[in-house]
Amino acid sequence: MLILTRRVGETLMIGDEVTVTILGIKGNQVRIGVSAPKEVSVHREEIYHRIQFEKSQQSIC
């Protein structure tokens, strides 16, 4: 795992096409913006797991 320190307004590049920008910090919450091509899915972890669960349920039926 890569661990980085970023300040508000700073950006992290993932590959050539995905950027993650720190938009704000308030208490223990960090607001981030993700810019990625349409073919790249971007989800919060809990949503991603829900999607995977629903896909597995559909394949069982």
From Swiss-Prot:
It holds the Pfam family CsrA. It is found in: Cytoplasm. The keyword Transport does not apply. One of its GO terms (cellular component) is cytosol. Keywords: Activator, Cytoplasm, Repressor, RNA-binding, Translation regulation. GO terms for molecular function: mRNA 5'-UTR binding. One of its GO terms (biological process) is positive regulation of translational initiation. InterPro entries: CsrA, CsrA_sf. NCBIfam families: csrA, PRK01712.1. Belongs to the CsrA/RsmA family. This is Translational regulator CsrA. It comes from Baumannia cicadellinicola subsp. Homalodisca coagulata.
